[in-house]
Every structure is written in C-alpha cells, then in structure tokens.
Design a protein with these regions (language model features):
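Glycine-centered flexibility sites
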Residues: 86-87, 115, 231, 241, ...
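Conserved alpha-helical substructure of the radical SAM core
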Residues: 2-111, 118-121
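Radical SAM/AdoMet-radical enzyme domain recognition
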Residues: 67-84, 92-178, 185
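Flexible mid-to-C-terminal extensions adjoining Fe-S/redox cofactors in radical SAM and related proteins
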Residues: 14-30, 50, 247-316
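Short secondary-structure boundary/capping segments
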Residues: 24, 123, 225-227, 281
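Radical SAM enzyme [4Fe-4S]-AdoMet core and its adjacent flexible, acidic
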Residues: 130-260, 270
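Short cysteine clusters
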Residues: 40, 44-47, 228, 241, ...
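Processing junctions and N-termini across compartments
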Residues: 34, 38-41, 222, 283, ...
Length: 316
C-alpha cells in the first residue's frame, strides 16, 4: 500500500506525534529530500530559499536535470522514501511525469506546494500522494486558499502548513478556526532565521498551536558536537544532482545569510558528490556535526545523539 494512501487514515495530530518514533523504528530506511527546482512564483519576504537568498541563482533552470536523467539516476539509490520540496516544485514542468515513473522500489512520502497552479496540474499525478499545502498570506487570501484546498481534497490527501512569522502569529488562532470549519488540518512551523527570535510572549502563543513534531525551537548558538545519521539514511538531492547530507548543509555551503555563522568552520563534509557520478555512494557511518541543526525537515529525518566527537566518525 502506498504511503500516500495510508496517510488518509491517520489523524493529523497522531501523524505528527508518531513522526520521531517512526524514524527510530525504521532507522535504516533511506529518506530523500528532493529539490527538482528552486524556482518559485512567490517571493515571500521571510523566505530564506527564494527571497532573502535566491537559490535559483545558484541552481538556475538550465542546471535542472531532465526527467529521463532523473529516472536513471534514482535507480542507483536503495529503496527510499522521497519527499519533494522547492521552490515551487510544480514549476518543474514535468514533475507529474517524473513522479508517475519513479522506480517502483521508491515510495513518495509527499510533495509541498503553494497550490497556486491549476488543479489540473495536480491531477496529472496518477499515484496516491500526500500534498503539504503551504499557506502564504502575502500572496493569497484565506478564502481563496481554502477554496483551492477544498477543490484539491476531492482527489488528494491534503494538509495545510503555515509558518509562524511575526506577522502570521497573531492571526493563527483565527486561521486555525476557519480551517477547522472546513475540516482542514493546519500545521504550524516556527519561523527559523538566525537573525530572528521570538519574545517570551510570542513563544507562549506559539506553543498553543505547534504540535509534537515542532515543539523545540532552533538554538543558533548550539555548536555542541552531534552524532547525526544524515548522509547515511537521509540525503538532500539538488536540481543538478548534487547531494548533501542535509538542507542545513547546502544552506551553510551556498547561502551568504549564514556566512558569519559558519566562518572558520568546516562545511565540506556536508557535500556527498553528485548522484550522476559513477562513484557516488551513501555514507557508511554517522557524521559528527558541530553546527546548529536549523531545518525541521532535517530533524524529521535523521537520528541525532548529543555526544563528544569520536575519532572513528566523520566530523563536520
């Protein structure tokens, strides 16, 4: 049974509660966070991927691999759970074709989208999948967004996600209530930016709406060594085939937003080569990372142990 089908029968809160336990239970299963494009049709002021720094300038459309190339390269990987992110992934025009023809050994965990494209685009995907619909209030009203979600729910399993920016936080209660009247599940992500921190009052407000998988906030002063399974059972696959251990890893490598944070700190060990290289291989052991684990998508997918670095492990 496809994961997308199973998710239909799991209540949202239960799913988020079980997420870390699932990872421990299936500790060896490979998870792939796949970024087919960093292009986006929105420019949210708070976005560290498309606006505050635009990764599409590092990975322009011309660098993106073709569907037929991806289908061959993905055969190299062991059976994996694949989650597709971006940018707006559906700006990669042949994404439905790619998803429909994924090697049978892989499972599609979900796709994130701002759901701004016509419903007909999403209908092109023939296999069951979970759609994580991102609500961006700078570009769409709640009423218009809900209308689109209800349209997509006719044939898809959909959850809605919103980022608790300082502008969004005061209205999350009303948004949650409005979504609830339409039987739409709302998931709240804390806003993560190394130049931003919540006040004590804001943290208290945030705790009312974050679920079990998002209770902890990122400490950008955390330079303690962490034994991490990224690179062994979790990778990030970028538009040109580059592979990084984690999303934080390619952010620390490419984004000037974090230049001061990582100054004089090694970041080379986040790189794993390119999936299209003949000698590409997953890491055979955990790494020890001393940089902040800033991305929730990374923490969802790895096993982390706080401990002193050991000589036998690769160190970042």
């Amino acid at each position: 049974m496809y994961v997308g089908s199973v998710q239909r029968f799991i209540p949202a809160r239960m799913k988020f509660f079980l997420k870390p336990y699932y990872r421990r239970l299936f500790s060896e299963r490979l998870h792939v966070l796949f970024w087919p494009t960093f292009r986006c049709n929105y420019a949210c002021t708070y976005c560290t991927v498309c606006t505050k720094f635009d990764f599409a300038k590092v990975f322009p459309k011309a660098s993106e691999k073709r569907v037929e190339q991806w289908l061959v390269a993905l055969e190299k990987l062991p059976p994996a759970m694949i989650y597709i992110s971006g940018g707006e992934p559906f700006l990669y025009a042949k994404l439905p074709e790619l998803v429909n023809n994924l090697p049978k050994k892989h499972r599609l965990l979900g796709i994130v989208s701002n759901v701004s494209l016509p419903a007909s685009v999403y209908r092109k995907i023939e296999r069951p999948f979970h759609l994580n619909a991102s609500f961006h209030r700078e570009f769409v009203s709640a009423e218009s967004f809900i209308a689109r979600i209800r349209e997509l729910q006719e044939f898809l399993h959909v959850h809605v996600n919103i980022v608790a920016t300082r502008e969004n936080l005061p209205v999350i209660a009303s948004i949650d209530e409005l979504m609830g009247t339409h039987r739409i599940s709302l998931h709240v992500d804390p806003y993560v930016d190394h130049e931003f921190s919540y006040s004590a009052e804001e943290e208290s407000m945030l705790r009312k709406y974050t679920q079990a998988d998002r209770r902890s906030l990122v400490d950008f002063n955390d330079f303690n060594p962490k034994q991490c399974s990224a690179g062994r059972n979790y990778i990030n696959l970028l538009p040109d085939g580059q592979v990084f251990t984690c999303a934080a890893g390619f952010s620390y490598t490419y984004s000037p937003l974090y230049a001061e944070l990582v100054r004089n700190k090694p970041v080379d060990n986040f790189r794993m080569g390119n999936l299209f290289d003949d000698d590409f291989a997953l890491n055979s052991s955990d790494i020890v990372c001393k940089l902040p684990c800033k991305d929730a998508c990374d923490r969802d997918s790895v096993l982390i142990t706080i401990q002193p670095a050991e000589e036998s492990l690769q160190t970042t």
